[in-house]
Amino acid sequence: MSDNESQWLGKTYNKKNIQECISKIKDKFGQQFSDSKSIREQHSHTMTIHESELPDGVLFASNKNDVSDAVKICNDFRCPIIPFGVGSSFEGHVNAPFGGLSIDLNNMNEILNVYQDDLLVTVQPGVTREQLNTHLRDTGLFFPIDPGANASIGGMSSTRASGTN
């Protein structure tokens, strides 16, 4: 393994490939992409004891096509992907030890369907639990999971967050 590579769980990450991937993402998404240090720091801060490690760039996804296109590009270059919701990160999951692309899902915050009789709701990953419960208030339904912070549904799902309720 060269100085330009990192390995974890049998996967090798090449810094040159990651930089090429980030360049391609930047070209494709333009203003939806940022590689500013302050934005990258905001997207790597965790509530754990571990030191934050920054992604190489952040994509502010607006829809599932943005996510799909970014994932395809990252796959071509074997570039790590770090999904980002609200960013409370009690689990340290937004840390980027190998760099890569943080995909911010906050703009994907629509409640798509409420099937009251079936007790079923379809949401985008950026919807927060407070947003969902406000929307459901007049239906007699509520989302009982409460991890303490106003976490996104996508973040809660990805980390199995359950809270105290």
For every predicted segment, state its role.
Residues 64-165:
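FAD-binding glycine-rich core of flavoenzymes that anchor FAD
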